Design a protein with these regions (language model features):
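Selective recognition of hydrophobic, aromatic-rich stretches within alpha-helical transmembrane segments
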Residues: 3-13, 52-80, 104-144, 172-202
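Residue-level signal for short amphipathic helical patches enriched in basic/charged
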Residues: 17, 36, 63, 78, ...
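N-terminal leader/transit sequences and adjacent low-complexity N-terminal tails
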Residues: 1-12, 18-22, 26, 34
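Interfacial aromatic "cap" segments that immediately flank transmembrane helices
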Residues: 20-49, 83-109, 123-172, 202
Length: 202
């Protein structure tokens, strides 16, 4: 109960306003990636297969994202990435699928009405997977807490969103192979952002 209370207090504090240094987050994310580049790149072969297909991305994207964040957290804590960590996110398969489906429906409805609401929801739910994976929240509570957290400085999170999108676009241009670097790097940067706003305990 104490952990749940603490995370709600952290979210409440974040919603009142926070500042992010995009340059610092890119550096922190890169430092995490460079400590285990081979492990991240190997997992990204599977990640690419999942995210390159809309259906598999919708159904498996949640657990894959959680696995990336889990690995980034282990590296930051000074631990080695082991084979079992690659699919750790699948331990919460059901809740993460539910989360992805909820996000998909809400963002799709937003895009159907106007593009702006869809983009708003997509950015607002950036941190949803963290609340499910690290804090055992249900999907509906996770998207609520993510939106509330991002509301503390939507502009900077959106800017980070754009920069990571540009980085991955460059990865695609590099014969597609570059994505094996830019995709895990992006997950490490998003992890760094969330950890900066809502500190993840051991």
């Amino acid at each position: 109960m104490q952990v749940i209370q603490d995370i709600h207090e952290q979210v409440e504090k974040a919603s009142s306003g926070f500042r992010l240094s995009v340059e610092n987050l890119l550096q922190v994310g890169f430092n995490i990636f460079r400590k285990a580049p081979a492990e991240f790149m190997v997992f990204s072969v599977f990640g690419l297969l999942v995210f390159s297909n809309p259906i598999s991305g919708l159904l498996l994207g949640g657990p894959v994202s959680a696995s990336y964040f889990h690995m980034a957290h282990r590296v930051k804590q000074g631990a080695r990435i082991e084979a079992g960590d690659y699919f750790k996110g699948f331990e919460k398969f059901g809740e993460l699928i539910k989360l992805n489906l909820l996000i998909f429906v809400v963002v799709l409805l937003g895009l159907a009405l106007l593009i702006v609401p869809g983009v708003y929801f997509a950015v607002s739910y950036t941190f949803s997977h963290f609340f499910v994976w690290f804090f055992q929240m249900e999907a509906t509570e996770a998207i609520r807490l993510s939106r509330k957290t991002v509301s503390g400085n939507f502009g900077q999170v959106f800017l980070l969103f754009l920069i990571l999108g540009a980085i991955n676009f460059l990865g695609v241009l590099a014969l597609g192979i570059g994505v094996l670097i830019t995709m895990p790097l992006s997950f490490c940067v998003v992890y760094a952002a969330f950890d900066d706003i809502i500190e993840i305990s051991n």
